[in-house]
Design a protein with these regions (language model features):
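Alpha-helical transmembrane segments and their immediate juxtamembrane cytosolic regions
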Residues: 1-231
Length: 231
């Protein structure tokens, strides 16, 4: 059995805690309106925090096997999130603001499935492509277009809204930067800090079970905050 890289599991677990915090604030402020708090710095933090997951995923893809299979699984989990939010909206349990189009799981899945197209490129070319994707994606954030069919890339149509939106630009760029880091830092495909009894067990556990935690945490948070709001 292949030994896991414990520090990447711990980093993924720590990143999950940050995202859970972001979703808790979303539920309190935007979904139920029980807390009036929305400073500018937090908006910047929230809008860019997903890059952490893309970087970690990019590092990890250089260590694992079957990225297309794994990516398809993650994408399907993301599609499940979209289906659930759409069902909640259609059944009247939530407003349109809850809908998820191209969320972080769908983006991660697409990046993994696309990785074989970039895998043979040398690292300088990957970094050049990543820089172009990131620059284009950051520019697209301030633009709107009259066509909807390139939304997955970051070309947002007029009136578009999504509670979780991670287009390929700039996020595929962050993923490719992570892949370059993975090549550099994990050439031997093993931990850089080999320990008999690695620390941060809780974070490691979260990192190993990140997909399940991501799928379950928001319904639990929404239910708890909803009960709090009603009380």
């Amino acid at each position: 059995m292949k030994k896991r890289v414990w520090e990447l599991d711990a980093a993924r677990g720590l990143a999950l805690i940050g995202m859970i915090g972001i979703h808790l604030i979303y539920d309190l402020v935007e979904l139920y309106g029980v807390w009036n708090w929305n400073p500018h710095w937090y908006q910047v933090f929230k809008n860019n925090y997903g890059a952490v997951f893309l970087l970690i995923s990019g590092i990890s893809v250089t260590l694992g096997s079957y990225p297309v299979k794994r990516g398809f699984q993650v994408f399907c989990c993301g599609f499940l999130c979209t289906a659930v939010t759409y069902g909640m909206y259609r059944l009247g349990f939530a407003g349109k603001e809850i809908l998820i189009y191209i969320g972080v799981l769908q983006c991660l899945g697409l990046c993994m499935m696309l990785w074989p197209l970039f895998e043979k490129l040398r690292s300088p070319w990957l970094l050049a492509l990543a820089a172009g994707m990131i620059a284009l994606g950051l520019w697209l954030r301030g633009e709107a277009f009259s066509f909807p069919w390139l939304t997955v890339l970051g070309f947002v149509p007029y009136g578009f809204a999504s509670s979780d939106y991670f287009p390929l630009f700039p996020n595929l760029g962050y993923f490719l930067v992570g892949a370059v880091l993975g090549r550099k830092l994990y050439r031997e495909k093993k931990s850089r800090f080999p320990l008999e009894n690695p620390p941060l067990k809780g974070l490691q556990w979260m990192g190993r079970n990140s997909l399940l935690i991501y799928l379950l945490h928001q319904p639990v948070l929404a239910a708890v905050v909803g009960l709090f709001a009603m009380g």
